[in-house]
């Protein structure tokens, strides 16, 4: 989730290998309008040091692929996840809220290029707080487009924005440059743990897009 044009769909594509922007109107306007979906597998390499030991691949990948860093085969599947790419534009707030209802955790993107918080940054964060969502990671995106001082100032603004809320990790990244994506994967594994499921209960489906 996050403000419009802060890099949500780009990060989703980097993590999953799938472009969540599917519809013609989205491609023309370069914004997410409907909820986007993509699946991915997160792996750990037993031979590489953290955080380089974390990597992700498409959902169709084998459960023990070679490590892209060391090319070794001592890898382990840690998570098989689904990502919901929510629109950031104010006009599609209702669509975003329907996506939040199905989430086990939240990845909030904030662009280092702009002051924090932007309008939809605030609205989206308030929405996940209203649902009682506690598993939150913040990605400070686009750090490749600002100076080190600008990135530090923006980081401090983010910290002030979430002040008083414990256990929220802020990870500086550049989605388009694939910078610090391994840290994002590490925090996804450690922060957004799978909820307990009653596999003997009757199945229940939540329809969030038709």
UniProtKB/Swiss-Prot annotation:
Residues binding GTP = 5-10, 141-144, 174-176
* Purpose: As a subunit of eukaryotic initiation factor 2 eIF2, involved in the early steps of protein synthesis. In the presence of GTP, eIF-2 forms a ternary complex with initiator tRNA Met-tRNAi and then recruits the 40S ribosomal complex and initiation factors eIF-1, eIF-1A and eIF-3 to form the 43S pre-initiation complex (43S PIC), a step that determines the rate of protein translation. The 43S PIC binds to mRNA and scans downstream to the initiation codon, where it forms a 48S initiation complex by codon-anticodon base pairing.
Span list, region G2: 30-34
Residue intervals passing through the bilayer: none
Using the UniProt annotation, give all residue ranges assigned to the region (G5). 174-176
Write down what this protein is called: Eukaryotic translation initiation factor 2 subunit gamma
GO CC terms: cytosol; eukaryotic translation initiation factor 2 complex
What is one Gene Ontology biological process annotated in the Swiss-Prot or TrEMBL record? cytoplasmic translational initiation
Oligomeric and partner information: Eukaryotic translation initiation factor 2 eIF2 is a heterotrimeric complex composed of an alpha, a beta and a gamma subunit. The factors eIF-1, eIF-2, eIF-3, TIF5/eIF-5 and methionyl-tRNAi form a multifactor complex (MFC) that may bind to the 40S ribosome.
Q: State the family it belongs to.
A: Belongs to the TRAFAC class translation factor GTPase superfamily. Classic translation factor GTPase family. EIF2G subfamily.
UniProt keywords (A-Z) are: Cytoplasm, GTP-binding, Hydrolase, Initiation factor, Nucleotide-binding, Protein biosynthesis
Q: Which domain of life is it from?
A: Eukaryota
Kindly list the places in or outside the cell where this protein is found, as annotated in its UniProt entry.
Answer: Cytoplasm, Cytosol
What are the GO MF terms of this UniProt record? Answer: GTP binding; GTPase activity; methionyl-initiator methionine tRNA binding; translation initiation factor activity
| Catalyzed reaction equations | GTP + H2O = GDP + phosphate + H(+)
Its Enzyme Commission number(s) read 3.6.5.3
Q: Which PANTHER family match?
A: EUKARYOTIC TRANSLATION INITIATION FACTOR 2 SUBUNIT 3 FAMILY MEMBER, EUKARYOTIC TRANSLATION INITIATION FACTOR 2 SUBUNIT 3-RELATED
Domain tr-type G: from-to ranges: 1-196
Start and end residues of each stretch annotated as G3: 85-88
Q: Which organism is it from?
A: Spironucleus vortens
The record, for InterPro entries, names: eIF2G, P-loop_NTPase, T_Tr_GTP-bd_dom
Task: Give, as one word, the top-level EC class.
Answer: hydrolase
Q: Does the keyword Protein biosynthesis apply?
A: yes
Q: Does the keyword Hydrolase apply?
A: yes
Q: Where is this region: G1?
A: 2-9
Q: Where is this region: G4?
A: 141-144
């Amino acid at each position: 989730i996050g403000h419009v044009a802060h890099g949500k769909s780009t990060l989703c594509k980097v993590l999953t290998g799938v472009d969540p922007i599917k519809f013609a109107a989205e491609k023309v306007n370069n914004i997410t309008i409907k909820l986007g979906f993509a699946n991915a597998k997160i792996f750990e390499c037993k031979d590489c040091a953290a955080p380089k030991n974390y990597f992700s691949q498409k959902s169709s990948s084998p459960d023990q692929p070679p490590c892209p860093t060391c090319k070794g085969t001592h890898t382990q599947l840690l998570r098989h996840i689904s990502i919901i790419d929510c629109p950031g534009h104010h006009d599609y707030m209702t669509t975003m809220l329907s996506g939040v209802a199905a989430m086990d955790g939240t990845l909030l993107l904030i662009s280092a290029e702009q002051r924090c918080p932007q309008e939809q940054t605030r609205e989206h964060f308030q929405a996940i707080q209203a649902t009682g969502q506690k598993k939150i990671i913040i990605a400070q995106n686009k750090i490749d487009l600002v100076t080190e001082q600008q990135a530090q100032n923006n980081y401090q603004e983010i910290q002030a924005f979430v002040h008083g809320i414990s256990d929220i990790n802020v990870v500086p990244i550049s989605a388009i440059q694939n910078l610090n994506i391994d840290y994002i994967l590490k925090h996804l594994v450690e922060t957004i743990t799978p909820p307990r499921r009653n596999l003997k209960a009757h199945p229940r489906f939540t329809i969030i897009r038709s």
